[in-house]
Amino acid sequence: MTKGIFISFEGPDGAGKTTVLEAILPQLKKLVAKEVITTREPGGVAIAESIRDLILDVNHTNMDDKTELLLYIAARRQHLVERILPELKKGNLVLVDRFIDSSVAYQGYGRGLDADAVTWLNNFATDGLQPDLTLYFDVDSQIGLTRIEKNKEREVNRLDLEQLDMHRRVRSGYLKLAQENPDRIVTIDAARPLEEVITDALFIIKQRCLEK
């Protein structure tokens, strides 16, 4: 069975990862013989998108932290079996906007839940699947929140309402994950001009995944 390439895009809110993903897509399609599939978490398929709406609804500020975690994991499982795995089996290049690292950073470090438990639950839901490459877009938490506030086209969600300290804990979690997984996670300084970040992201993908 042909195996595709699985790349995740990670980063705190306001890092610009989604913008970079969209920007490099046309160039990647020219470089790859198979299809290039883009998707997101939570979401990507109908059931997971419905769960996304529940999680991010600004009216659900009383959501319990463990409830939030389990909803993310449920969405991830459905997305995996319905979208990610079928595309990888076809040998396609799959780019996903957030994956397991988001849960560990946000629910583990950000919410203060047991990071090992968060990791175990996610591994259970994904049968241990890990991306071949993870691009982590790093930016100071205050800069990220300022970008969100200035982006009038972006819809505000429940996580945007969190205090700065929460976002700093999330960033700290991401940095620790990057330190612990140097073979998989490549850190990109996302505080630089967007064009530089886009250039770096495309170069890393070509070097690590497309030129072997």
UniProtKB/Swiss-Prot annotation:
It comes from the Bacteria. Signal peptide: none annotated. The keyword Nucleotide-binding applies. Its EC number is 2.7.4.9. Keywords: ATP-binding, Kinase, Nucleotide biosynthesis, Nucleotide-binding, Transferase. Pfam families: Thymidylate_kin. GO terms for molecular function: ATP binding; dTMP kinase activity. The keyword Mitochondrion does not apply. ATP binds at G11, P12, D13, G14, A15, G16, K17, T18. It is an enzyme of class 2 (transferase). It catalyses: dTMP + ATP = dTDP + ADP. GO terms for cellular component: cytosol. Belongs to the thymidylate kinase family. Phosphorylation of dTMP to form dTDP in both de novo and salvage pathways of dTTP synthesis. NCBIfam families: DTMP_kinase. This is Thymidylate kinase.
